[in-house]
UniProtKB/Swiss-Prot annotation:
One of its GO terms (molecular function) is aspartic-type endopeptidase activity. It catalyses: Release of signal peptides from bacterial membrane prolipoproteins. Hydrolyzes -Xaa-Yaa-Zaa-|-(S,diacylglyceryl)Cys-, in which Xaa is hydrophobic (preferably Leu), and Yaa (Ala or Ser) and Zaa (Gly or Ala) have small, neutral side chains. It is a multi-pass membrane protein. This protein specifically catalyzes the removal of signal peptides from prolipoproteins. Its EC number is 3.4.23.36. Keywords: Aspartyl protease, Cell inner membrane, Cell membrane, Hydrolase, Membrane, Protease, Transmembrane, Transmembrane helix. The lineage of its organism: Bacteria, Bacillati, Cyanobacteriota, Cyanophyceae, Oscillatoriophycideae. It is found in: Cell inner membrane. It comes from Microcystis aeruginosa (strain NIES-843 / IAM M-2473). GO terms for biological process: proteolysis. HAMAP family: LspA. Pathway: Protein modification; lipoprotein biosynthesis (signal peptide cleavage). The keyword Coiled coil does not apply. This is Lipoprotein signal peptidase.
Length: 155
């Protein structure tokens, strides 16, 4: 059924599972919001926070339209991969990662009204984020790579 754009579906499903499992583990492992566990003290911690905004805490403060944007992007990407053209490998990876991130954070927004974040790079004082945010950024990088000219294979 999903033979066309197979890598899109594989990346999206695996990414979504990883995102949701890591968020679940975070919620179950910490007693309260704000608790932290240093992996490399002062550099990288697992810190349990909730985020009512977008990636990397942009638009903080309960922006309700983000859940609808996540849903629209997710449905649009799935329709494009299923009904649209056969995508090259980089495009499949790109859109699969973006779907995993958008759908993962979208699920959280619809169920809880916020997203669970836990990756805390303190060395550079960066906002706490999650795997869905990482996947969206990896997807954007893959999409940029897909625009580079590639040599075609000689049969």
């Amino acid at each position: 059924m999903f033979k066309k754009n197979r890598w899109f579906w594989i990346v999206a499903v695996i990414g979504l599972i990883l995102d949701q499992v890591t968020k679940y583990i975070t919620v179950q492992s910490f007693e309260q919001i704000g608790d932290t566990f240093p992996i490399i003290p002062g550099v990288f911690h697992f810190t349990y926070v909730i985020n009512t905004g977008a990636a990397f805490s942009a638009f903080r403060g309960g922006v309700g339209w983000l859940k609808w944007l996540s849903l629209l992007v997710s449905l649009g990407l799935m329709a494009f991969a299923y009904f649209g053209p056969h995508l090259n490998r980089w495009e499949q990876l790109a859109y699969g990662f973006i779907l995993a991130g958008a759908f993962g954070n979208g699920i959280d927004r619809f169920l809880f009204g916020y997203v669970v974040d836990f990756l805390d790079f303190r060395l550079i004082n960066f906002p706490v984020f999650n795997l869905a945010d990482v996947f969206i950024n990896i997807g954007i990088i893959c999409l940029l790579i897909s625009t580079f000219p590639h040599k075609s294979r000689v049969p």
